Amino acid sequence: QGKNLILFTAESFSPWFISEELTPTLYKLSHTGILFENYYGTFQSVTTNGEYTMCMGLYPDMSRTKTDSSFNVAGTNYLPFCLGNALTEKGYQTWGYHDYIGDFYNRNITHANMGYTFKAADSGLDIKIDWPSSDLEMMEASVDDYLSSREPFHAYYMTFSGHYQYNWDNAMSAKNHDAVKDLPYSEPVKAYIACNLELEFALRELCRQLEAAGVADKTCIVLTNDHYPYGLTEEEYNELAGQEMDLTFEKYRNSFICYVPDLSENIVVDEYCSTADILPTLLNLFGVDYDSRLLAGTDVLSNGIHMAVLSDKSFLTKTFRYDAGTETVIPADESIVISDEQLEAYRLYVDNKFQMSSNIVNSDYYAHVFGKASSGGTLEDTVVFTDITGIFNQASVLYMYRNGYIDPETPDTFGGKATAKVGEFVD
């Protein structure tokens, strides 16, 4: 609480290319602070969905296309929980950056609406537009904005250098070819590592400038991916990882880097978690009052239900995994038995995370909840949440269906007095 925050959604990031020798800055950041051992990136592909989920603490409406995404819809919605808006209310200076053109996915609209003074490669950032562009150049062109402003500050970056295709026509792969040419990998894997080195160089420059400005010990750095690096074949990703990956679950294992510089010792968290959980966790850590009933993600450091959720509604918990594609339950060990009733409760719980999230964005629900001017959508019998003045830990889905605001078996029912179909769920 009170520290500066620099947050990254890193294009096609994978922790498997991190090493102390090749990427010392990423290695340090990923081994210092709060270590989330069982974090999974939710998405196979589509940057806008992964970025949306991280920024909103909600799942996107999966029926939408990339050009009509949930992020586009949210561009005119009331968004009180996004970090840009939430930290502005706490007196932070807030900045947002992307090293490609600003109207790609309409980030010039969506990111301003999240509370950021937003700059992109063609609007405020003096960098070369390439495919992909340089994360290092973006850092060099942006860091003075917030280091020269008053503290505290929050900066958000959507990176680009790690974008596929992974060959030597990729501008960043070609730039960093010499650094990887002797590595014992195939050409596509070397090209993947090469373009991702540009993120390492950007982070190295960031840390250098934080030290020079005297604020390194007051600045937290958080980083995760937007999606699995789908530009690599499964065989190439196995090669990068150095092991045969479980394609249903483990290929989604990723990093929620939460670098906190002045902890006396690292905090290790073994709860299962995924992309939507980052926002509520950071809101808690930075002392922002919020109502957890209105987010699909869960503060990973809180008590309650913890799971990693994937985009096809497969999920992982400490006791079992569920493959939604095959409707298969995989217990953590042979002594664990999952009843049909318990599985159904979990399955509906995950279904409703997606349903609630879609309805929130499609109806501009937060505007109704907080009595703000809405960009569109109408709801009857809504509840204004005026009873919560501090952080409140109750899973949003549990609140919604226990109080009749979601009918798990009727996807179109939201905001009215639906009859809950699911019994009590373990808190």
Describe these PLM feature segments.
Residues 1-379:
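Solvent-exposed soluble domains appended to multi-pass membrane proteins
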